[in-house]
Amino acid sequence: MAFLHNGNHTAVTEFILLGLTDDPVLRIVLFTIILCIYLVTVSGNLSTILLIRVSSQLHHPMYFFLSHLASADIGYSSSVTPNMLVNFLVKQNTISYIGCSIQFGSAAFFGGLECFLLAVMAYDRFVAICNPLLYSTKMSTQVCVQLVVGSYIGGFLNASFATVSFLFLFFCGPNIINHFFCDFAPLIELSCSDVRISVLVTSFSAGTVTMLTVLVIAISYTYILITILKMRSTEGRHKAFSTCTSHLTAVSLFYGTITFIYVMPKSRYSTDQNKVVSVFYMVVIPMLNPLIYSLRNNEIKGALRRHLGKKIFSQSNILFY
């Protein structure tokens, strides 16, 4: 039942997600592509986590943060992708009011967590390049755990504000969301209550997370750039810069798409463009992060080769004996 009658009001109990397209052929094509992307996302990030756990060579702060970023990527993609895949297979995809709240809150949690972890990783690179002699002290195990716990708390607070904002909205009219997940903008358009408080709270929370993390990243890389430019050795410059390239790529992709959706005026892009960009930063980027961090990282590639070599060697011994 999509509507619940309560006195003079009719409350919406479920929403209809329109998804990406109505074309049946395109739905099958997109289902196949996004399913493959999701499987690569989960397997790639899980492989990253396991490789970091089992490789003693990767037991460093940078990889500790990377393993949590991989976990956040799995959660972020999983908050919307399974429901999107179902949308491709059914004629009309519905999501309950509570389900919509959970989806919106989980996306806000993992999105906020990803922002904080990217900022923490930038700070880690700053300490490693600008204060290498104090690195072991400033990035001790206790400090690393505190930074990660703080990131999870930040993500939880962002999700709490988002969920409370959603629960303050009242829906009594149309229940069709022109999106593939419960995003805030289309929900605001459907609400028949005063949305000013919800918009203010959500904007404050998301804006604070974004501005705070961008500030940390910008300051960290400003000092990193100054330090690199002061280096006399060309080899030292190249080595220092190469350690930051992967992280800068991930930051640029993630914050670039967020800026397109939430900062640019809506008059400059259509709803369909919004959907495409949302797919990119919620589905594609979580798949790309393991590739970005591993392809240019010799330590990860070396650890992977060692473990694959051990596995192949052990299997050959079993076959031999």
UniProtKB/Swiss-Prot annotation:
It comes from the Eukaryota. Its main location: membrane. It is a multi-pass membrane protein. Glycans are attached at residue 8. Keywords: Cell membrane, Disulfide bond, G-protein coupled receptor, Glycoprotein, Membrane, Olfaction, Receptor, Sensory transduction, Transducer, Transmembrane, Transmembrane helix. It is found in: Cell membrane. Pfam families: 7tm_4. Residues 50-57, 124-136, 221-240, 296-321 are cytoplasmic. One of its GO terms (cellular component) is membrane. The keyword Cell membrane applies. This is Olfactory receptor 5P60. It comes from Mus musculus. The gene is Or5p60.
